[in-house]
């Protein structure tokens, strides 16, 4: 779950408890506007995905996994970029021809909006 501040984490106690009680429930947070206790700057969800790809790759590679992206418009582009760079976008989105010859790291928000088409396994609600 990604939020600007730890105080914005909804259902944090519940998700933390579920993660402790169930080995198949995993709860990860990305806090963007707070410095971490180790002095590292905040991070967005796509930064967390990139840093912990070894953890997320098996989950995202599973054909039964569904992805729900909700939040500010623009944040989905970072997720799509990281997923495409690691070749785990298949099943979640397809690319239109206009993005075929552009490296995912070079995609901008307008290109993502026009050139990425999500599948039934990827729900996006952005505002």
Describe every region a protein language model picked out.
Residues 1-127:
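Reductase modules of NAD(P)H-dependent flavoproteins
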């Amino acid at each position: 779950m990604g939020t600007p501040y730890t105080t914005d984490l909804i259902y944090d106690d519940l998700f933390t408890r579920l993660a402790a009680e169930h080995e198949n429930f995993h709860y990860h947070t990305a806090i963007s506007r707070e410095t971490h206790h180790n002095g590292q700057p905040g991070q967005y969800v796509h930064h967390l995905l990139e840093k912990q790809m070894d953890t997320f790759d098996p989950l995202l590679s599973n054909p039964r996994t569904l992805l729900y992206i909700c939040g500010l418009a623009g944040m989905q582009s970072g997720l799509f970029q990281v997923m495409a760079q690691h070749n785990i976008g298949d099943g979640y989105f397809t690319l239109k021809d206009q993005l075929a010859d552009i490296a995912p790291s070079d995609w901008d928000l307008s290109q993502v909006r026009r050139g990425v088409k999500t599948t039934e396994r990827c729900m996006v609600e952005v505002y």
